[in-house]
């Protein structure tokens, strides 16, 4: 029958119901019971049709059901007016057709129970017997559904008025389970005896009716008198028996789902072995995978929040997990059969649910064994799958592999994990690798990274982040984000043994240097900084052990430093030296591997390493060679690379700034370094840069060597470079800087090596240039700032002269600004 025909028939029936509804209401208003029954019979006759699909019949039924509520209320009013309930019960049986008679019998029977609770048992089983007369599957299902809905609140239950007087709780269970059984049989009959396309249509019809059958289980689950014990002893075995005996795929699938989702989780936990055993007896076409997913996901959530549930699992763990393993073995075996159309996504999702359940509920020692069992099964499934792995499979596999990362299990004990990861696409591998890193960085993992073996395994797990893969496609931002996360691993190593740390850092180096230039730029500097930081900790701890660490340097980080490392095996200066030199060689090797692609970063890292070596106080003479080697390497990078002028000037000043802190070098080495810087300053492009660098060199001579003659020579050269730079008037500030530097030396030296003539000459040059700029109307925007700087300098000289400090100030002339 076409859809248009269905709509036409349904519309006609609804119009009849609407018309009869009007007549029924009219008779109710007149309190005419006989006529009301007559009109109701006519309305209910519409439910006798066999021409509507289940969906349309349900529409028809709901319209009738709404009207039956008005009729039920009218019957109740009639009883209040004195009509005998028994007469009413007999009157409704006058219809010659069974459907109208059944609906009115059920309605009056419900009222009968309500008024005479003691009759409950007799009436409900009487009604249950008479509805057997409706053998048409669709009409029979809806009649029984109406029966269940009409008396659902009138069944004997804990603490209600029908319990004891009108029966007991066992009667209620018997009634609902028997109704479930009969409805299930009718439901199955809907598709019996047909094949092909007709079978498919009938199965579709049946699927639309399943909620009617499920109402029985919903009602059972809502009974207050239903205890765990009764569920185990009476309810579940009978329902499972109904399911098994039905031998119907749709029935078994749906009713098992109802059991899983309707009854309390604590009940199903107690009966888990029975439920799992039942799955082995279902017909082969039942989707066991979906049942496992629903059951295990639901129970996992429950167990997670219930200690009592965990205890239940613990008490029966061997049985439960043995049955689960057997069930999954059968599931995989069945799905991997040649010729079977494997739903690999559902298979993997069911395994994911199983793994979650294991992780949450298994408190025994075999948790790891079970998780590895699931991973091995997944590997078998992937191998057996003959088709290309698509996005949906990858997503399912990704969820499976992400599950153990949320547990306390050691990632390193999951043998199949890296192998399964290889089946993912690039982005999924990347994301999973990041989750692995986060589990360690954020402290989710209980595993300590305290051995080379673990580091090797970890780096193998996150291999997608460490090398370029054929299908890799990433924007620069995501790439850098990933690599910074990789670098974080270096700082969560959990051992204080220098020897183990050396081996771990060496392993990081061996992997990182093969990652390509873009990765090395991020990962190697982090590794070097970690090693330098470790060297500080070792040297500070050893200095303190030998009472060589300066008291004034013991800041808030001091205790953290000495407590972060175990130097118990470093018991001599030679042993200490050998340990440190080994780390310095490692630092040098790593920087050399970075130097070609990132010379600037390498330059800075060499200086940081040299600064650490210089900080050593114990046996410091032996370490000078290592310090000098690092500084020379930095000089080498500066000399070998041709940078823009401004950048080269910045690097030279950085080098000069670092040199100020190298207080443990010999005088000879310091002189050589200063001369190299001085020579480099002459080769700078800009005169202003040459001037500033020469001023800085004067500071090196002053602070490190107290070589005042060289200080004067540098200042004179700086003045010469400043003179040559005055083609740009803005460089006038260089003279003010030189003047300030000379005053600094006067203030910080007991020896009067600065001559007043030099100061007066500089002072005169400054004033002359300022006057010239004003006379030529070159009052450029920068000039007020320079004048302000110069004025503050002159004011300071005046103050010093007034208080009689340092006789040289009295020899400074011409300091009044014109």
Please give the residue ranges for each predicted region.
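Long amphipathic alpha-helical scaffold regions
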Residues: 1-428, 433-436, 635-638, 644-665, ...
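Extended, charge-rich low-complexity regions and/or helical-solenoid scaffolds
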Residues: 445-770
């Amino acid at each position: 029958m076409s859809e248009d025909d269905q709509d036409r028939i349904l519309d006609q029936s609804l119009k009849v119901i609407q018309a009869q509804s009007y007549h029924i209401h009219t008779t109710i208003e007149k309190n005419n019971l006989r006529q009301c029954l007559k009109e109701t019979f006519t309305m209910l006759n519409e439910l006798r049709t066999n021409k509507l699909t289940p969906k349309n019949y349900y529409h028809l039924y709901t319209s009738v059901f709404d009207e039956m509520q008005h009729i039920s209320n009218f019957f109740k009013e009639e009883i209040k007016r004195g009509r005998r309930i028994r007469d009413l019960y007999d009157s409704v049986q006058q219809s010659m057709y069974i459907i109208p008679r059944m609906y009115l019998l059920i309605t009056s029977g419900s009222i009968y129970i309500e008024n005479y609770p003691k009759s409950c048992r007799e009436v409900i089983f009487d009604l249950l017997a008479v509805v057997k007369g409706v053998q048409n599957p669709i009409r029979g299902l809806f009649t029984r559904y109406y029966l269940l809905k009409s008396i659902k609140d009138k069944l004997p239950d804990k603490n209600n008025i029908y319990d004891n007087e009108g029966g007991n709780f066992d009667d209620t269970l018997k009634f609902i389970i028997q109704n479930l059984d009969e409805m299930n049989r009718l439901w199955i009959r809907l598709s019996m005896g047909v094949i092909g396309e007709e079978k498919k249509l009938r199965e579709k019809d049946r699927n639309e009716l399943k909620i009617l059958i499920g109402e029985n289980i919903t009602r059972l689950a809502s009974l207050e008198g239903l205890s765990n014990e009764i569920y185990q002893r009476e309810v579940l075995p009978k329902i499972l028996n109904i399911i098994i005996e039905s031998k119907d795929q749709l029935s078994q699938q749906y009713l098992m789902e109802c059991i899983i989702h309707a009854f309390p989780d604590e009940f199903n936990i107690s009966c888990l072995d029975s439920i799992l055993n039942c799955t082995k007896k279902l017909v082969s076409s039942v989707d066991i995978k979906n049942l496992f997913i629903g059951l295990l996901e639901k129970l996992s959530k429950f167990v997670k929040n219930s200690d009592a549930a965990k205890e239940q699992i613990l008490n029966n763990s061997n049985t439960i997990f043995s049955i689960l393993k057997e069930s999954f073995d059968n599931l995989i075996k069945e799905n991997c059969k040649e010729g079977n159309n494997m739903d690999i996504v559902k298979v993997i999702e069911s395994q994911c649910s199983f793994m979650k359940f294991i992780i949450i509920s298994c408190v025994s020692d075999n948790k790891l064994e079970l998780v590895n069992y699931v991973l091995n099964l997944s590997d078998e499934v992937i191998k057996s799958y003959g088709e290309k792995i698509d996005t949906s499979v990858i997503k399912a596999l990704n969820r499976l592999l992400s599950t153990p990362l949320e547990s306390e299990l050691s990632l390193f004990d999951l043998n199949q994990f890296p192998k399964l990861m290889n089946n993912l696409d690039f982005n999924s591998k990347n994301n999973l690798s990041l989750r692995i890193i986060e589990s360690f960085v954020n402290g989710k993992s209980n595993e300590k990274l305290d051995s080379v073996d673990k580091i090797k395994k970890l780096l193998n797990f996150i291999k997608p982040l460490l090398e370029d893969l054929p299908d890799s496609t990433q924007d620069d931002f995501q790439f850098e984000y990933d690599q910074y996360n990789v670098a974080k691993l270096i700082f969560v190593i959990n051992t204080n043994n220098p020897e183990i740390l050396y081996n771990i850092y060496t392993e990081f180096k061996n992997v990182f240097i093969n990652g390509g230039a873009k990765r090395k730029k991020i990962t190697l500097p982090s590794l070097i900084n970690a090693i330098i930081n470790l060297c500080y900790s070792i040297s500070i701890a050893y200095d303190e052990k030998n009472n060589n660490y300066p008291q004034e340097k013991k800041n808030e980080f001091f205790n953290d430093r000495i407590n972060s490392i175990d130097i118990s095996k470093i018991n001599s200066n030679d042993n200490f030296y050998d340990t440190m030199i080994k780390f310095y060689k490692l630092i040098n090797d790593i920087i050399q591997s970075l130097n070609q692609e990132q010379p600037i970063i390498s330059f800075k890292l060499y200086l940081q390493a040299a600064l650490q070596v210089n900080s050593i106080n114990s046996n410091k003479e032996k370490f000078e060679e290592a310090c000098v080697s690092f500084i020379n390497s930095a000089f080498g990078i500066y000399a070998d690379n041709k940078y823009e002028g401004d950048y080269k000037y910045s690097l030279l000043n950085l080098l000069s700034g670092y040199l100020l802190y190298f207080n443990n070098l010999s005088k000879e080495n310091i002189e050589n370094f200063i001369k190299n810087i001085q020579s480099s300053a002459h080769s700078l492009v800009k005169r202003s840069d040459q001037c500033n660098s020469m001023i800085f060199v004067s500071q090196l001579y002053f602070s490190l060597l107290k070589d005042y003659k060289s200080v004067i020579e540098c200042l004179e050269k700086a003045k010469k470079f400043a003179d040559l730079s005055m083609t740009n008037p803005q460089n006038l500030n260089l003279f003010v800087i030189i003047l300030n530097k000379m005053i600094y030396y006067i203030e910080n030296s007991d020896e009067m090596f600065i001559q007043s003539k030099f100061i007066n000459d500089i002072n005169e040059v400054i004033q002359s240039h300022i006057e010239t700029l004003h006379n030529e109307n070159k009052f450029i925007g920068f000039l007020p700032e320079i004048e302000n700087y110069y004025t503050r300098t002159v004011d300071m000289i005046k103050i010093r002269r007034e208080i009689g400090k340092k006789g040289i100030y009295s020899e400074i002339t011409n300091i009044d600004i014109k």
